[in-house]
Amino acid sequence: CTEIFAQARFRKSSDSTIKVIKAEERLKLENIEKLVEATRNFENLEPGKKFTILAPNNKAFKRLNSKTIDYLLSPEHQSDLNDMLSHHTIEGRYTEKQIRAQIEKEGGKTYFKTLSGFSLMVYLDKDNTIIFVDQNNRKIRMVEPNYGKGDNIIHIIDGVILPYSSIY
């Protein structure tokens, strides 16, 4: 089911999101860059729609099993890679300011549905940092907001959002 969902949602990408990721060398995004290039399907999921992409920095991937990237890049695990990327993509273009406003409007926490179907809980911690909570109850911080122009926006996060049944 996950593979069918991913294939139905993702289409060939234009290069704009990958160009933003590559252009921001100081953010250390080489790992997510490799994964996005391997699928070539990170944006333009449905023509005319806008998306928010949560891009893990390299430090985020270092916290995972050392073989995770190799696993995700192998052709036989393409559906796992698509699933992982869909956990990092939210339909709708939400700036940091809009996310904060939604948290405030909802009384301290809110939810954003990812393309995988998971409702990602979002709140502000005591330091006023935006925190995302994945299915494994791991807390992931937004560390660099608001990259990109046009229909899609990228926020850099310090963790990898993992599916509950994840083997990573």
Q: Where do the PLM segments sit?
A:
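Mature, structured domains of secreted/extracytosolic soluble proteins
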Residues: F5-Y168
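Bacterial N-terminal signal peptides
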Residues: C1-T2
